[in-house]
Amino acid sequence: MSKKVLTAYNAIDHTYFSQLSQRNKALYMYRSILRLANKWESDSQREDIRYETRSTFQKNKDLTDTEIINDKIEEARSRMLTALHYNIPYEKKKYNIPKYQIQMKPPPDPKDESGIC
């Protein structure tokens, strides 16, 4: 019997996940991430995943605002799927491209005869 390969597509049973309570979703994510860590190739990365998972969930255990909790669950799900897809256990860097304000001059007023714009 071959081992089931964990991918971004089969890591989460979305039908089951959508029916869970908020607490159970958090537990489901916690267990899923630890299962992912057990299957990770590199020992050092495996330990990093376990440590970060435990510390992050421990840090957020006292949250009470449902919106923030849902955001944290979604963040955990997203990071797990990113790790599976890119095969990297660390958060993918986000690049912020600076937005420059371009000040455009208004078009010249056709009624203005001064010629100065």
Curated annotation (Swiss-Prot):
This is LYR motif-containing protein 1. It comes from the Eukaryota. Pfam families: Complex1_LYR. Belongs to the complex I LYR family. InterPro entries: Complex1_LYR_dom, Complex1_LYR_LYRM1, LYRM1.
